[in-house]
Curated annotation (Swiss-Prot):
Native source organism of the sequence: Rickettsia bellii (strain RML369-C)
GO MF assignments: CDP-diacylglycerol-glycerol-3-phosphate 3-phosphatidyltransferase activity
Gene3D superfamilies: 1.20.120.1760
Pathway: Phospholipid metabolism; phosphatidylglycerol biosynthesis; phosphatidylglycerol from CDP-diacylglycerol: step 1/2
Protein name as catalogued: CDP-diacylglycerol--glycerol-3-phosphate 3-phosphatidyltransferase
Lineage: Bacteria, Pseudomonadati, Pseudomonadota, Alphaproteobacteria, Rickettsiales
Catalyzed reaction equations: a CDP-1,2-diacyl-sn-glycerol + sn-glycerol 3-phosphate = a 1,2-diacyl-sn-glycero-3-phospho-(1'-sn-glycero-3'-phosphate) + CMP + H(+)
């Protein structure tokens, strides 16, 4: 089967392109819009798995993709967190922990790239990303887009777990930079 050599990059770009549509659906006061926004967020989140999987499996890894993929993840998660903070009752603490870690780690990754140190993505970091995206999917849908009474609470609990893992996984980047302090 022939795969377009840019497919992983197209998936990453699609993840970024989905952000304004997800935000728009959140501002439409309709359960259907909330369901559509949550579905679109889930699909955008799934591209995070497939872009990397396809790139590695078919040897389509590019410097552009390696640079853009983590940016797309942070944009998707960050924009949705900011949207939720502005328009819902989501707890600020796990959201701010996640945002702070993502900004710090982005800076540390840039520094580590300058000194030619690579920090591989751990299984725990992949679990963290999955839980962040799962929690945010639930919170985007929320009780306004579903008849499930405790859906917001479930989303918040998962978000707290993701925030805890966010701090733990961020430590590996600080550890890699320690000898440069």
């Amino acid at each position: 089967m022939k795969i377009d050599e840019n497919l992983p990059n197209y998936l990453t770009i699609a993840r970024i392109a989905a952000i304004p549509v997800i935000i728009l659906t959140f501002y439409i006061n309709s359960p259907l819009a909330r369901m559509l926004g949550a579905l679109l967020f889930v699909l955008a989140s799934i591209t995070d798995f497939f872009d990397g999987y396809i790139a590695r499996k078919y040897n389509l890894v590019t410097s552009f993709g390696k640079m853009l993929d983590p940016i797309a993840d942070k944009l998707l998660v960050g924009c949705v967190i900011i949207m939720l903070l502005k328009k819902s009752d989501v707890d600020e603490i796990p959201c701010l922990l996640i945002l702070a870690r993502e900004f710090l780690v982005s800076g540390l990754r840039e520094f580590l790239a300058l000194v030619k140190v690579s920090v591989p993505v751990s299984t725990l970091a992949k679990t963290k990303t999955f839980l962040q995206m799962f929690a945010l999917s639930i919170l985007v849908l929320g009780s306004k887009g579903s008849n499930i009474i405790y859906l917001d609470l479930v989303g918040e609990i998962i978000l707290w777990i993701a925030a805890f893992l966010t701090i733990i996984t961020g430590y590996s980047y600080f550890k890699a930079c320690k000898k440069y302090f």
